[in-house]
Regions:
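Glycine-rich phosphate-binding loops of nucleotide-dependent enzymes
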Residues: 2-7, 35-283
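Cationic, low-complexity basic patches in intrinsically disordered or flexible, solvent-exposed regions
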Residues: 23
Length: 283
């Protein structure tokens, strides 16, 4: 669980007021959430907006993720899912709004590297692994250790690191294939390996973009099991279009539309929402 700073409430209030002044707003917009939500959440977005060349990609987005929570994010193309993740990871800075991590850290003030070091990891839809290295070496390269490839590969692996690698390979079900080249893996297995590489960075929050895309039915089912196992010790945001996969996850769903939250709740509830049916499910 994430340890929260006892002084986070006052610090977070100062961050919000500073953002208001910085963007020239005469009055503080009404917050969607309570102060308790700000300081108790692992991730807190409130009133976040960003525009690109006059197009408002995110408009007044408010969202909280609790420590140890897995959340599914759905929405049609252009709903703002990718931009939301870009904001969380520091790739895109919002025009206005509050983005806090761990109750006290203002993510809008940090660059991508600092946010990654803080404990936010992102997995893109297309897996990126070192094809000509073994599965085990891919995990070793991702561990928090000396950063150059040569130093990492030839570094004396301590017992604790060896155990960590074994644990990760067990979680992603690739322990028996540890000596295989990553390039020989199936698409689904490469997805699992990249998730394992993300785990090697000890993230508090994982952002996972369409993990089931291009997978067989069997791989999709295994991926749901994998993410549920990971969510026992981490917070996870899953962006996905496969409703069957989301049903397997069995988690709260947030529906985005035109850059803001349209609906939230269990999948059956949001699927029955008339507005969701109209703008997302297409019937």
């Amino acid at each position: 669980m994430t340890a929260f700073n006892p002084g986070a409430k006052d610090h977070a209030k100062g961050v919000i007021d500073s953002n208001i002044r910085e963007h020239g707003l005469g009055e503080k917009p009404a917050s969607t959430f309570s102060r308790h939500a700000l300081t108790s959440s692992l991730l807190y977005l409130d009133g976040v907006s960003v525009s690109f060349d006059g197009f408002k990609a995110i408009r007044g987005l408010s969202l909280t993720i609790e420590p140890g929570e897995m959340r599914a994010i759905i929405g049609p193309n252009g709903a703002g899912k990718t931009t939301m993740m870009d904001i969380i990871t520091g790739k895109t800075k919002p025009d206005v709004g509050t983005v806090m991590f761990g109750g006290s850290v203002d993510l809008t003030k940090l660059d991508e590297a600092a946010i990654a070091n803080l404990g936010i990891g992102r997995k893109f839809q297309k897996p990126t692994v070192f094809d000509f290295h073994t599965i085990e070496d891919n995990i070793l390269l991702a561990l928090k250790a000396p950063r150059s490839v040569a130093r990492t590969l030839f570094w004396q692996t301590a017992a604790a690191q060896a155990k960590r690698i074994d644990d990760i390979l067990g979680i992603i079900k690739l322990g028996d294939a540890r000596d295989r080249l990553a390039g020989s893996l199936s698409h689904g297995q490469k997805q699992w390996l990249e998730i394992g590489m993300l785990l090697a960075q000890d993230p508090k929050l994982l952002l996972v973009d369409e993990p089931a895309a291009g997978m067989t039915d069997g791989e999709t089912a295994e991926t749901a099991v994998l993410l549920k196992a990971i969510a026992k010790d981490h917070s996870v945001i899953v962006v996905e279009h496969d409703m069957g996969f989301i049903r397997e996850l069995g988690v709260k769903v947030t529906v985005l539309h035109e850059g803001s939250v349209l609906a939230e709740g269990p999948l059956d509830v949001v699927s029955a929402n008339e507005r969701v049916v109209e703008v997302y499910l297409g019937r």
